[in-house]
């Protein structure tokens, strides 16, 4: 692995790693044993990977401004965006350095977080037909400052990691603002565990990025765990960044 930017798990518990390296998509079993890899020389800058109920794989390339959907065998189903063509910064048009896809399991519609040079979430149907978008630059409700990651819960609600606003915003399926979780440190990724009676939410937080806080504690990088009402249940990673067990550098993807 070079930079493992995102990770997903399919229905047979295979771990799919999106890697910035010679082998961009690497698949392991649940014990970490290498199984296979594919799509060499396809991606410019791997950023976010997601899997739907049929084990189709969505790969977001922030370098060439594309979203690609593959079947479980790695065959391309469709591509959104054209390599080398980026929408004008903050134009609101897809795509301007997109980051992640989230699939609504109840409808198979999906959402694209867009991203570094836009302040939008775009919604598409399962065939890649554009439906609508929402969001704008800012710090208010429904506004974004780097739409860095996105996920959905068992009811189809949409959770957006609004990284530089240090929060997670929650929307319904029509893009209507519902709520937000604050007191986060650069919320970079979010995973919703839907296997139990109640959804559990894992939020990866970056280090604050301020040199004077290099030795600070409980500022990130860390993983915060919430219930559906936004109650903090636990946190992993109390110390500053580092290689030892229980510490992180930059939690960029969770599954």
Language-model region placement:
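Eukaryotic scaffold repeat domains enriched in small/polar residues
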Residues: 1-255
